[in-house]
């Protein structure tokens, strides 16, 4: 899935050392149970590297740095529980592990993380070119969501 996303989102012959290094970390993590967390963080890094990074540092509405639980699909910025409660149905879930250095996601958080990165990859990279997420990435999301539903 990572190779398919990288191939479809990065210009050919353009060097992106951070993406390459992150991919090596991801490949090393495949032998561990935490690889889905590493994968989601890799996708966040890819978005940042190509100019579509999410701002998860503070609430877009209030500037608060605590209790960040959603991301605005319009701005890609974090939203606190207090500021976003009235709009919760329109916001994307922000998995807590993305806010904690070294944090690892549980099954539901992994599903939410894949939905979050998938949304921004689709909207910013693929849809403008009449494309969708690569099939391998779609299958990865479906399989991990199925595991979290069990």
Language model features: what each stretch is:
Residues 1-150:
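Non-catalytic alpha-helical scaffolds and adjoining flexible linkers that form interface surfaces
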